Amino acid sequence: MSNGALRLLAGAGAVDDPVYVDDVFSTYVYTGVYSNTDIVNGIDLAGEGGLVWTKKRNSTRAHDLSDTARGVTKSLYSSAADAEGTDSQGLLAFNSNGYRIGGSSSYNNTNDEYVSWTFRKAEKFFDIVTYSGNATNGRAINHNLGSVPGMILIKSVTSSTYWP
């Protein structure tokens, strides 16, 4: 290619690297071992933030949701009205390539089967925000999606109320 053509291409502007679904989302199936375990799924939760949604597959135990906005050891249960719970042996760390779990029966009980879905914060894909409610209908909640949300989940973390 001629130097002139190279200059034209360079002058056209840089293009961001594409973001693929496996950069921002992971389904991970595992068997519990009841000790601290790193779940390596390639999702950068430490640097980018996100949510880990875990379900024990061989029982009726609730789905556990932990996210970087509320911090490690904090859980919400999608099938319960409970306020935010604390599980000091649940999700222990958000890592640059996944996350670390302890020996909690919600995440890592010996020989129990689990599935986790990890969502990384990314424009036009997923975001987590926290806010204080003020009982105002039609209130706008700021987010970093850069687009209109396709789905919104809301849950009080301080009171026992069902998910709307």
Regions found by a protein language model. Name each.
Residues 2-164:
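Surface-exposed molecular-recognition determinants
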